Amino acid sequence: MSWDYKVSERALKQLKKLDKQAAAQILAYLDERIAGTHDPRQWGKQLKGELNNIWRYRSGDYRILCQLQGEVFVVLVLEVGHRKNMHQ
């Protein structure tokens, strides 16, 4: 079974605030690495502690925070932003 991704309204607003090139880079990353993959965990890192249900992905200088929804094979994009401002 392959995975797909959905972008939350919050993440969509954050994408719109970025310059067009950065937003395109992030969406291209999601299309190339996440959409159609059999295991999105291979591309990211799981956060620790209370946030261990969140995965982070890095696309250039940007981080993408996601929640894996295994029962429907969807990666829900929660937040995007420059990595200096995102959770480690």
Where are these regions (language model features)?
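Enriched for short, Lys/Arg-rich terminal
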Residues: S2-A24, A28, S59-R63, Q67-Q88
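A short, surface-exposed loop/turn module that caps and links secondary-structure elements
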Residues: E32-R56
